[in-house]
Amino acid sequence: MNLLIHDANILIDLIKLDCIHYLFSLDYEMYTTNAVRYELYDEQKRILDIYIAENKLKIRKIEDSEDDEVTQIFNENEGVISYPDATVYYVSKKMGGYLLTGDQNLRLFAEKYGVEVKGIIWLFDEMKRKKVLTLSLYKEFLKKLEEMNPRLPKKEIEKRIK
C-alpha cells in the first residue's frame, strides 16, 4: 500500500517536533481531508500549505454527494469519533490507504470496519527503514516524542531507543 491518510494529531505532533519535512520525503501518496485541515491552528495550516502547494500533501475534499454518508458515520458514532475522524475513516475506506492516527477511539473504530491503521511510531520506523532518518535522528525524535506525548506506549519507544 502506497497511500497514507492523515488524521490531525500525527500532523500536529510532527509539526511540534519540527520534523514534518521528513514525512514528505517518504515515497507515499499522502492525503488529509478538508475537515482535518480546518481543525489546525493558522500556523500549522501555513506549514502544511507549503507541502500542499508542492503536491506532497493532497486535501481530499468531502463532496456534497459524500457528506450524507460521512455525516451518518459520525452521527451513528457520536461520542466515539469526531466529524473530522469520520472523514479520514471514510477516505481511507474508499481509497484503500493506511489511516494514520494516534487517536485510540478512531483506531479501534476503523480497525473494526477493516481499515488498516498505523500510528506515529510506525511512521518513524518507516522513516528509519527508508533511510529518511539516520539512526541518531530517529532516536532523538523518539525521545522528544516520548516527552511530548506520555500516552504513547513507553515500552515500544524504549526498545527502539536502546
Segments from the language model and where they lie:
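Active-site-proximal, substrate-binding regions of enzyme catalytic domains
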Residues: 2-97, 104, 115, 140-142, ...
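Acidic, PIN/NYN-like endoribonuclease modules and their adjacent C-terminal/linker elements
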Residues: 46, 107-162
